Amino acid sequence: MKKVLFLTYLLLHLFQTQALDFQDTTRFSNSKLIKFFTSPKYIISPFAFYLPETDLVIGVGLKKFYHLGNDSTTRTSNVASSLQYSLNGQFLLRSQYQIFAKDEKYYINGVIGFSRFPITFYGIGNQIDMTKNEPVTYDYFRFENLIYRKIGKNNFAGLGWRYLNTFNVKTQQNGKMETEPIEGNKGSTISGLNISYLFDNRDNILNPSKGFFSQVTYSIHGNITGSSHTFNRWLVDARYYLKPFRKREDVLAFQGYGFLTNGNVPFNELAQMGGDIIMRGYFQGSYRDKNLLAFQSEYRLQLLKRWGIVGFAGAGGISNEMGYFELKNIMPSYGGGLRFKINRKENVNLRMDYGFGNGQQNIYFFIAEAF
């Protein structure tokens, strides 16, 4: 679990902005500084954390909001960028974007980034020993882009390309990654075509309070697409949001998620349990295999204008074969967290989640909801 050394800016921002809700802003000489870090158009968030394999990591995140059309017919577009650097010389630079053209005639979704950061490799499959893990470091370039065209009300059809290059792989001597026949342990070049369908009538893509989201994406990788490994992948993501009480702003959210592959899949393209999105509480990648099915629900309770709390629970499992999930391998995920509305105009929350899994637990600090 990440040991958070300090979140100075975030904590100062929370308490100072909360005070501004109840007191005259002229009493705060640093109100301009607060406005600099958070405005209706962007959020800047410095951060720091510690991991044994990286030493101290410092970084900054920027989330930019803008509209390309009328607010009533075009939802908010956003670009989220982050830069991280560790005292061991590791770094990560990444930008993710969700762009709605005027009247949502087109929707573009993608990510581009480069990293040289270690991961912890526990093995592949359900039968792993959590104490026998090893660090793996590699250079990683990633570009994925999907362009959707509206084909009906809230319906979109999309085409895209994904290119991921893993190189300079450094493994533990005599470790699993070096001695076992693991796909991609010497590096890989993944290049493939994405074909996607999307239905989305959510009122807000970063913090929905109502609506339905359904996405099915099929990815093809092989020699013909310039890929070093031949495999296919299905991603299925369905979410539903509702307000259970008319006079309150509470939200009840549900998500079903499937990650299904076949073929020669590199280790870092396998389905992974854990992290800040799917199956919170587990270390990301502590369980990985060709296929993953998961379900989670979350209740978001608003307490004050800016503050709220959540409770979440879910279950999921991995398997080597697409149609073979054993009940005994289904694992639980549950926990709770705090929410602070860091941007009222776009209804964006800063979230802190504490999740528990099967013998694991983890804490997460992020901007925007998990789903």
Regions found by a protein language model. Name each.
Residues I195-L198, N204-L303, F312:
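C-terminal outer-membrane beta-barrel translocator/porin domains of Gram-negative envelope proteins
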Residues L20, F28-P40, L68-T76, K102-Y107, ...:
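Short loop/turn motifs that connect adjacent beta-strands in outer-membrane beta-barrel proteins
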Residues K35-I44, Y50-T189, D289, V348-N349, ...:
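Gram-negative/organellar outer-membrane beta-barrel architecture
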Residues F65-G69, Q84-N88, S115-I119, L164-N168, ...:
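Sequence/structural signature of outer-membrane beta-barrel proteins
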Residues Y42-I44, S77-S81, Y106-G110, F156-L159, ...:
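Transmembrane beta-strands of outer-membrane beta-barrel proteins
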Residues S81-S82, Q127-N133, M177-G184, I220-G226, ...:
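Extracellular loop and loop/strand-boundary signature of outer-membrane beta-barrel proteins
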